[in-house]
């Protein structure tokens, strides 16, 4: 099995509601980055802002029930289904119950608990 992985362009920062406005202002007003609020239909994320961060996109997600922030990453695979089986053989199982996502993606976690969205390389992930 010759599966290749590479980092994706999307980075999500899950932010507690009490710190959300200050965090958005930091990226927009202090760092002067391009920050745009985007519509989101997700039961666990109440608001989201897209931040252009060099070649990457940082998603500032307001999560009402969080007490601290978390950073979630994107990982792409050359063979999505094969990668899912390969990761399971290494003890890395999907955890799609974390948050609603498209059917052709999975949530996984590294051993330290960093959440990653796994998707097929060369496909576009949309909210």
Mark where each language-model region is.
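Vicinal oxygen chelate
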Residues: 1-7, 85-127
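N-terminal beta-strand motif that seeds the catalytic metal site of vicinal oxygen chelate
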Residues: 1-24, 71-73, 122-127
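Amphipathic alpha-helical segments
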Residues: 18-35, 87
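Short secondary-structure junctions
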Residues: 32-40, 92-98
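Conserved short beta-strand elements that form part of the metal-binding/catalytic scaffold
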Residues: 34-71, 115-122
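Short hydrophobic/aromatic beta-strand element in the GNAT-like acyltransferase core
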Residues: 48, 74, 105-107
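Mid-chain, well-packed structural core segment of small domains
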Residues: 69-88
